[in-house]
Structures are given as structure tokens and as C-alpha cells.
Amino acid sequence: MIDSIFNFSKSSEFHQFCELSAAIGRNPLLVQGAGGNTSVKEDGLLWVKASGTWLSEATEKKTMVAVDLAKLQRAMAQNDERVEKPQYFKADPAESLRPSIETVVHATLKHRVVLHVHCVETISWAVLENAEKLLAAPLEGLDWVFIPYRRPGLPLAREIQSKITDKTNVLILGNHGLVIAADSVKEAHQLLLEVHQRLRRTRREVTIPKSNFALTAESNYRDAEF
């Protein structure tokens, strides 16, 4: 298992995954601060963003941690309470990084590459009361589902599990964000761009209110209490 960790972490595919993760992390329309998480599955391992790390630094410092995928999935099937603490399923117990609390969400999806972002465009729809109905038109033709808000971690993973099919690769998370799933880094990137573009809002013109500075120049209107 340790050899697998070393070999894949040195592969070109892993570097492509880290490059995409970093690019996503540098885009404030997709990720804010230390938010968002990404993963890639390889040789029985689930490489996922570590808790407390920044996606934007994925090519600069150690950001991903390997999880024993089969062990985690077995625990999920058995309702093992440890799945709420994915550090129990690290492939290398000596690794100091802790897997993201949303590791179980990544393990639930069968696709090789999973991107979870807090896309501003997506959230502008996902916060609406009738979001699922409104999203039907812009997302027509995609294999997508709407997931009502659930607490990150196992509750969210269970809700996803109850809604998806093997073909589902776009998940709109109510009041939360967006999940993209694909079988390659390139496909995941392309699908993310497509969904982001489809959900773009028309920018509104902002009118700057006029003020009669002559009337307010000698007043204390800024200090007034309301």
C-alpha cells in the first residue's frame, strides 16, 4: 500500500489532478479560502484534500492524503460510526494530514475524479426555495440531481446515495455548492466549466444614487443613529 502511495503521487495524472485542484482553488468564484475539496481514485486509494489545507496550494505543498477506499466503503455499508472521522481510514497511519470531513461524499461516487466547489453561480440558484425546478432548464441534457441541504459528512453522503444513479455526474447541493464527477481530470474540468457557464447569471447594472452634497455638507447625517 505504501508503494502505491509513493508511485501514484509521482505520476503525471496525479500532477494534472493537483494542477486542476490548484487552479480551482485560485478562482474565488469556485472556492473561497480553505473551502472546497477534490479527490482522485487510483489503485484502491482515494486521494482527497486534507482538512485545513488550501486547494490553491495543491502544487506547492502536500495537500492530498490517501485513504483506503475499500475499507472506508465497507465501514459506510456497515454504518460504522468511525466514517465521521475519516482519519481512521488513512492508507498510511503515520501520515499527519487528516482527510476532509467530506471524504465520505467522494467515496460514495464511483467516478475516478470528484470536484466539490462552492461555486458562486451555482449557489445563487441553490439557495432558492424552488431551486430544483428552476435548474431544470439551464441543466437540461446533463445527468444531474438536486440534493437538499444536509450536514457535511455522512448525512450528506447518505442523501446523495439515495438520489444518484450510476450516470449521475453533476450534483447541486442545496444551500451549499456543486459536485462534479468524471472518469478523468480532463473530463472533470470540462464538465465543471460547462456547468459554471450554464448557470451564469446576467450581471445587473448598478445605478449610483445621486446625492445633493451642498445640502449635506454642513450636516451630521453620517453620525445620525437609526
Model-inferred region functions:
Residues 1-226:
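Glycine-rich flexible loops
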